[in-house]
Amino acid sequence: MGQIRSKSGLAIALSRLKGFERPKVSVEQYTMDSEIGAFVLWQATLKGDIAQKVSADLGCGTGILGIGCLLLGASKAYFVDNDEHALKIAKENLKIVKSEFLIEGKASFLCNDILGF
């Protein structure tokens, strides 16, 4: 099992995740670019805001930010979206990552509007 040791390593891991096949324009669904996700998460990591912390990926879509948090050592990540199909993709993406990397944190998937979280 591998570990993430750099921002570029994180970007590569995130680039392997599945995106939306048919994004719903009405709810502004899109897949976050892996480089942007890696940049944001790496900045938070450098500030000590991810390792051993609980994260919430609100409006998670395909789960790139929550999965990135788990890759960087978050103790738990909540994945919240009001679209069951998006959560299904996020769960599949987590399985992909777990097959390659050691993930010790827990994941919780919630189908809910973020206002109800």
Indicate where each model-derived feature is located.
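Active-site catalytic pocket residues across diverse enzymes, especially alpha/beta-hydrolases
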Residues: A44, G48, G73, L94, ...
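Conserved class I S-adenosyl-L-methionine
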Residues: K53-G61
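Conserved SAM-binding loop of SAM-dependent methyltransferases across substrates and taxa
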Residues: T62-A74
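Conserved SAM-binding motif I beta-strand of class I
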Residues: K76-D81
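Conserved short alpha-helix immediately C-terminal to the canonical SAM/SAH-binding motif I
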Residues: H85-A86
